[in-house]
C-alpha cells in the first residue's frame, strides 16, 4: 500500500546505538512502516565490533523474515560476512572506492597496499583470481607506477578491482547460502579479509 500516494521503496531506519532496549523499541515503532524492508542505521561509527554484531544479531532475530534487511555504512569484508551470518541481506559503503583511492587493494590473496615498495618490481597480476580481466592482466608494479605518477587510470583499476572483489565475495556467499554451506570459514582467513 502506498503511504504517500505514489510508488516508493520505504526502508525505515532502526536506530538506538548499542542499547538493545532502544533498538527493539525503535524496531517495534518502525514495523508498521516497513513496507519494503528495514534498515539498520547508526552502527559502524566508532563502536567496537562485538557490540555492533550483538545489535545486528538481536535485530536479525526480531525483524520480519520476509523483508530484506539493510545494514547501512558497513563495508569491511569480514563485517559483511559476519552480518550475513546474522541475517543481513543488503549493504552500502564507500570503503571499496575510498580505500582504492589510497592504494589499498582487496584481492583473493589478501589485502595489499599497492604503494609499498615491495610491489615496485612485482610483475604478478593484481588479482589472478578476480572476475575482471584487467585485474588478471595488469601487474602490481604497473598499478603502483600509475599511483606514483598520479595517473587517474590507476584509481579506476584499483576501484574496479575492489568492487569486483566484493562482488566475487558476495556471489560466493550467495552460492554457499543456496548450497546450505555458509559458515565462519570466510572469517577464519585473516589474511584474506581486512
Q: In which residue ranges do the predicted regions lie?
A:
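Acyltransferase donor/substrate-recognition loop-hinge adjacent to the catalytic core
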Residues: 1-3
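Glycine-rich phosphate/ribose-binding loops and adjacent secondary-structure elements
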Residues: 5-126
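Gly/Ser/Thr/Ala-enriched C-terminal appendages of enzymes
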Residues: 94-171, 178
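Single conserved hydrophobic/aromatic residue that forms the stacking wall/gate
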Residues: 185-194
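Short amphipathic alpha-helical interaction patches enriched in hydrophobic/aromatic residues
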Residues: 42, 174-177
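Long C-terminal interaction/binding lobes of large macromolecular proteins
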Residues: 182
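Structural signal for well-ordered, non-membrane alpha-helices
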Residues: 60, 171-174
Amino acid at each position: 500500500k502506498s503511504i504517500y500516494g505514489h510508488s516508493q521503496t520505504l526502508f525505515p531506519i532502526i536506530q538506538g546505538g548499542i542499547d538493545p532496549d532502544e533498538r527493539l523499541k525503535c524496531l517495534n515503532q518502525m514495523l508498521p512502516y516497513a513496507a519494503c524492508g528495514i534498515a539498520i542505521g547508526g552502527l559502524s561509527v566508532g563502536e567496537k565490533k562485538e557490540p555492533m554484531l550483538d545489535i545486528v544479531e538481536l535485530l536479525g532475530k526480531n525483524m520480519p523474515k520476509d523483508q530484506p534487511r539493510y545494514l547501512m555504512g558497513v563495508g569491511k569484508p569480514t563485517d559483511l560476512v559476519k552480518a550475513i551470518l546474522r541475517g543481513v541481506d543488503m549493504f552500502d559503503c564507500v570503503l571499496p572506492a575510498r580505500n582504492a583511492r589510497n592504494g589499498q587493494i582487496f584481492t583473493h590473496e589478501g589485502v595489499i597496499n599497492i604503494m609499498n615498495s615491495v610491489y615496485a618490481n612485482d610483475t604478478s597480476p593484481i588479482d589472478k583470481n578476480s572476475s575482471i580481466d584487467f585485474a588478471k592482466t595488469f601487474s602490481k608494479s604497473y598499478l603502483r607506477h600509475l599511483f606514483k605518477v598520479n595517473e587517474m587510470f590507476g584509481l579506476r583499476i584499483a576501484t574496479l578491482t575492489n568492487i569486483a572483489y566484493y562482488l566475487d565475495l558476495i556471489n560466493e556467499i550467495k552460492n554457499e547460502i543456496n548450497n546450505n554451506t555458509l559458515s565462519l570459514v570466510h572469517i577464519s582467513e585473516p589474511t584474506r579479509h581486512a
